[in-house]
Amino acid sequence: DSLHVGHFMTLVLMKRLQMAGNKPIALIGGGTGMIGDPSGRSDMRSMMTNEIIDHNCECFKKQMSKFIHFGEEANDAKMRNNADWLRNLDFMEFMREVGVHFNVANMLRARAYENRMAREGGLTFFEMSYMILQGYDFYRLYKDEGCNLEFGGDDQWSNMLAGTDLIRKKTGKDDAYAMT
């Protein structure tokens, strides 16, 4: 229920972009939090209840508000929660519309999965789907909000590229970018 030092640079960048007249969109993972990011992990994350995830999301927004201004004005930051589009997703429709654009061989080469694949426990489909969901998040922000830049930690690089690739494949446009 608390941001960590790894979030600081992203928040500083969001603040600087906001000061320059841009409208930052902070995405919180009320949907992906149900799975947990396997990046940098040697074991599977424990699953949290919806109540804990929702509580954490509220805490994150409160903490982020100390850095960036949320509101309704032109360049006020906006908070989006991926639970809005992930929690009630139709699995078969999602696989037909989104899953078809992901190559498993390419996904397995991602840094986030290399160590896990080398271990005895391997990687579950549950965890592997995180990359697809994060890529879909960027696609939704691109489509719904006009967001064309995603930035995050270097441990998220493969997941962010999954988003730019999905946007290119679904829209035919090459104007979505990722930055660490």
Residue ranges and their predicted role:
Residues 1-177:
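NTP-dependent nucleotidyl-transfer catalytic core
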